[in-house]
Amino acid sequence: MFKGSIVAIVTPFTNGAVDQEKLRELVEFQITNGTDAIVPCGTTGESSTLDYDEHMDVVKIVIEQVNKRVPVIAGTGSNSTAEAIELSRKAKEAGADGVLLVTPYYNKPTQEGLVRHYTAIADAVAIPQILYNVPGRTGVNMLPETVARLAPHKNIVAIKEATGSLQQASEILALCGDQIDVLSGDDFITFPMMACGAKGVISVLANIMPKAVADLTDAFFAGDLETARRLHLNTLKISNAMFIESNPIPVKTALGLMGKCSDEVRLPLCPMSEGNKAKLTAIMKEYQLI
């Protein structure tokens, strides 16, 4: 259902407020450069520091600006099942094509708790839902066997697998077959994950290099594995640079250097250290982004 290059778009701020004009410009930058779908209010969109009204405003602005040209998948995850249901309902009402649901963070549910959490959301809201496993940020790893229990639900269509583990992604694909699509959650392993059967990537890198990420997934789908492999290797250095500090600090710093939007992030995130900014600047110059 959702495949290819899917950008986890940043939320631009100016003087502490969501910059709606810049957000619309970023959406156009993505669509112009071949991005297949857009995710507002994911990890990269700083969803955890948006209040409820801001969260829904960002989702609505992206849906309005996209105007049905590509799918919009709203980040609606929460460590409260009730809140995730409410956000998912509101996203559906706003016209989202799907929702992205991060595993509950901080409260560390058991695997049974994860099954009950996701089943409750899928039962409550009839919209295509993408599970999101990112244990490095949430403190809980959703095991392949747990994904296999959820995969038969008609509203659960995919998983964003961001453990960085090809073994775990492969186990999900082996267990679930065609019941659920797998999407890479890490730019630096998109190509090998697609070789295992993933359908694309929910990408941080696409914020600054949308065409390169789209070209990689397009080449793979066209059977041009050599081009896809070359793009994978060529973008590896800058993919890794997007994580020299906590996401989205590097990608927002990069967008600031490109003049696309402010590099402003919300506390407890803070501006990139001068040393890392110098390293990032040098890498961006190598890629002729600035």
From Swiss-Prot:
Active site: Y132, K160
Record field: catalytic activity: L-aspartate 4-semialdehyde + pyruvate = (2S,4S)-4-hydroxy-2,3,4,5-tetrahydrodipicolinate + H2O + H(+)
Residues annotated for pyruvate binding in this entry: T44, I202
Domain of life the protein comes from: Bacteria
MF terms (GO), sorted A to Z: 4-hydroxy-tetrahydrodipicolinate synthase activity
GO cellular component: cytosol
Keyword Iron: no
Pathway info: Amino-acid biosynthesis; L-lysine biosynthesis via DAP pathway; (S)-tetrahydrodipicolinate from L-aspartate: step 3/4
InterPro entries per record: Aldolase_TIM, DapA, DapA-like, Schiff_base-form_aldolases_AS, Schiff_base-form_aldolases_CS
GO BP: diaminopimelate biosynthetic process; lysine biosynthetic process via diaminopimelate
Record key words, sorted: Amino-acid biosynthesis, Cytoplasm, Diaminopimelate biosynthesis, Lyase, Lysine biosynthesis, Schiff base
Site positions per UniProt: Part of a proton relay during catalysis: T43, Y106
E.C. no: 4.3.3.7
Primary residence: cytoplasm
Subcellular location field: Cytoplasm
PANTHER family registered for this protein in UniProt: 4-HYDROXY-2-OXOGLUTARATE ALDOLASE, MITOCHONDRIAL, DIHYDRODIPICOLINATE SYNTHASE
Quaternary context: Homotetramer; dimer of dimers.
Protein family (similarity comment): Belongs to the DapA family.
Function in brief: Catalyzes the condensation of (S)-aspartate-beta-semialdehyde [(S)-ASA] and pyruvate to 4-hydroxy-tetrahydrodipicolinate (HTPA).
Protein name: 4-hydroxy-tetrahydrodipicolinate synthase
Chain's gene name: dapA
